[in-house]
């Protein structure tokens, strides 16, 4: 799964902006609105005037940082890193100053719109800098350095230096456990050098969060969901309990097949699964080992990888196909500048950040994607996902600055994944001419198993990345326990273990982009719930009567209008109200996941008879 690059996610230039769009600061130091006289209690009129001035300054500040981040991500050099860090520091200072000024109006009775803007202004920063000279520069430099270590990471393998992309290819294709272990350990070897910088980053970010009135950075992050931070943590626990039994069913089945393939010496029939055997560097998606775990006697009649190649797809055609999906829902075509300015393939002449991301440069229509696209099934889905971010960014661009963002950050990820759910169906592949006919029901279990290997296998990982960071920010996990606590969580939630004993200096969380990239991760867990909730509602609106997993909403313009109406709201109101606009529901509900995968869960239960499930 790939993510959208948002404010603060690219490690520097975006460190101080709304977490739903790539925006940045203007060049040169920016000044916050002048504080009201301290002798008098602030008034509602002053609060409204402050918000208007703050929005004007933030809007003016965005273009430079967005471009600085874009240039650094596409041309990684010491100079572009310096430029991005400078832009990020200036923006962080501005946003921190505005957030502190917003706190002056706590307790002032203001109209609902101003009240929401004041609240969002205090939550505008993913990692606030402490309010002291040099702190913003130090924080920005740390984040830029961490991101760049990850993005330029290479390690020695078979006599040459290889990148993450190369390593991912090995994990995807190799079935040699010794080779898998070597490559897994090789990539994780790039991260120990991040550990000290990450600890210093966490210290500075916590200091900045405390200056805004939050217990720590984790509490600040959890405050972004229109509920108390502790209530939000409890909400994620509730959702996990809804899906955990299904995950354990899948884990049990996959472990048995791995045992049959590799034997007890590599993968025992009981206990945790070895993390390097699952086809993905972080074991967050397991679809690449479908050949190992596929049902006996039942095969899929098509291979999307082969269909794409045989039909002459190249990276640009992949993106054009994604655009056509959204056009079929009634959305306007992408602007010409999208095609002129996006990075769609990996350049051969320079280092770039290959992690797929969607960008909104100017809050108008300069939207772009950046990804090193390959012609395969995974990137076919990723293209549909990333474009979902772009269409969401475009939908809310006419909102005031502080409302230009997702209803909550899980929405931004879910909207792209919602589109990808349709794009993954044989129905859609037939609609766009890649298949002559839709396979019969006998292929439902293989199809659903492939989906579950990615969608359900992801859920515990989507939860634990931020659980680890919440512990770090709260001081519950200290630097000397960074790695051991990481693996405690991976065992608890995923039922996984590393392929061998980890070195004393290991910093395995740093081998996952979103940690050095400083992108909150719970959004992806939520997105994997919301996308099925959206899909169920959309299929109902489209009049679909068959199994939920066979529904494609391609061509449903009326449904598209209602979906766009939800997107246009941005974050102008609490997310439950926005959710209700499209789904009629005001609560996140994982029952849609169960509805989608119902036939598979029953089949897995049958297959697991006699197994000692759990770990």
Language-model features, listed with the residues they occupy:
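Gram-negative bacterial Sec-dependent N-terminal signal peptides
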Residues: 2-18
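Signal peptide processing junction and immediate N-terminal pro/mature segment
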Residues: 14-36
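N-terminal helix-rich structural modules
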Residues: 35-200, 218, 512, 519-522, ...
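C-terminal, non-catalytic "cap/extension" segments appended to globular domains
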Residues: 37-47, 216-219, 284-300, 312-317, ...
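Active-site-proximal, well-structured secondary-structure segments within enzyme catalytic domains
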Residues: 161-164, 173, 200-370, 440-441, ...
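Active-site scaffold of zinc-dependent metalloenzymes
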Residues: 178-185, 349-376, 383, 387-394
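Glycine- and acidic
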Residues: 183-190, 222, 229-233, 299-311, ...
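Post-HExxH zinc-binding segment in Zn-dependent metallohydrolases
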Residues: 232, 236-246, 406-443
């Amino acid at each position: 799964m790939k993510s959208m690059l948002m404010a603060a996610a690219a490690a520097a230039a975006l460190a101080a902006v709304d977490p739903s769009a790539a925006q940045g600061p203007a060049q040169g130091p920016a000044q916050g609105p002048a504080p009201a006289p301290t002798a008098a209690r602030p008034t509602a009129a002053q609060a409204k005037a402050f918000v208007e001035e703050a929005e004007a300054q933030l809007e003016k500040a965005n273009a430079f940082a967005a471009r600085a981040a874009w240039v650094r991500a596409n041309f990684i050099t010491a100079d572009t890193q310096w430029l991005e860090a400078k832009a990020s520091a200036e923006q962080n200072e501005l946003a921190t100053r505005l957030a502190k000024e917003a706190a002056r109006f706590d307790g002032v009775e203001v109209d609902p719109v101003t009240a929401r803007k004041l609240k969002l202004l205090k939550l505008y920063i993913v990692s606030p800098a402490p309010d002291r000279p040099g702190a913003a520069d130090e924080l920005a430099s740390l984040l830029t350095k961490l991101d760049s270590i990850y993005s330029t990471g290479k390690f020695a393998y078979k006599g040459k230096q290889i990148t993450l992309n190369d390593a991912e290819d090995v994990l995807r294709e190799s079935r040699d456990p010794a080779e898998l272990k070597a490559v897994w350990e090789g990539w994780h070897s790039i991260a120990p050098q991040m550990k000290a910088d990450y600890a210093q980053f966490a210290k500075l970010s916590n200091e900045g969060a405390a200056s805004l009135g939050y217990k720590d950075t984790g509490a600040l992050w959890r405050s972004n969901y229109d509920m108390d931070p502790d209530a939000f943590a409890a909400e994620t626990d509730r959702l996990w309990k809804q899906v955990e039994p299904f995950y354990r069913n899948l884990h049990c089945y996959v472990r048995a097949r791995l045992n049959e393939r590799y034997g007890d010496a590599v993968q025992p029939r009981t206990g945790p699964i070895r993390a390097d055997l699952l086809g993905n560097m972080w074991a967050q998606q397991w679809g690449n080992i479908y050949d190992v775990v596929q049902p006996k006697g039942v095969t899929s009649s098509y291979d999307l990888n082969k269909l794409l190649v045989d039909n002459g797809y190249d990276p640009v055609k992949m993106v054009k196909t994604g655009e056509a999906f959204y056009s079929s829902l009634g959305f306007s075509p992408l602007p010409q500048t999208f095609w002129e300015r996006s990075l769609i393939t990996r350049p051969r002449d320079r280092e770039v950040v290959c992690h797929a991301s969607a960008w909104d440069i100017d809050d108008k229509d300069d939207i772009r994607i950046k990804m090193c696209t390959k012609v395969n099934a995974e990137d076919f889905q990723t293209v549909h996902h990333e474009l979902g971010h772009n269409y969401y960014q475009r939908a809310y661009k006419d909102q005031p600055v502080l409302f230009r963002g997702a209803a909550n950050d899980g929405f931004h990820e879910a909207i792209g994944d919602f589109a990808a759910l349709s794009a993954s169906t044989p129905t859609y592949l037939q609609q766009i001419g890649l298949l002559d006919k839709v396979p019969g029901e006998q292929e439902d279990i293989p199809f659903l198993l492939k989906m579950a290997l990615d969608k359900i296998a992801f859920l515990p990982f989507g939860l634990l990345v931020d659980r680890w960071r919440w512990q770090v920010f709260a001081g519950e996990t200290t630097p000397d326990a960074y790695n051991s606590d990481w693996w405690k969580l991976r065992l608890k939630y995923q039922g996984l273990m590393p392929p061998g004993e980890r070195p004393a200096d290991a910093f395995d969380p740093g081998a996952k982009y979103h940690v050095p990239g400083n992108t909150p991760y719970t959004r992806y867990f939520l997105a994997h719930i919301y996308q099925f909730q959206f899909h169920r509602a959309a299929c109902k609106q489209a009049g679909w009567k068959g199994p939920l997993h066979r529904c494609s909403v391609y061509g449903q313009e009326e449904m598209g209008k209602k979906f766009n109406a939800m997107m246009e709201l941005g974050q102008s109101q609490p997310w439950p109200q926005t959710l209700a606009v499209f789904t009629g529901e005001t609560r996140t509900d994982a029952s849609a996941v169960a509805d989608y995968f119902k036939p598979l869960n029953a089949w897995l239960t049958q297959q697991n008879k006699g197994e000692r499930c759990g770990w």
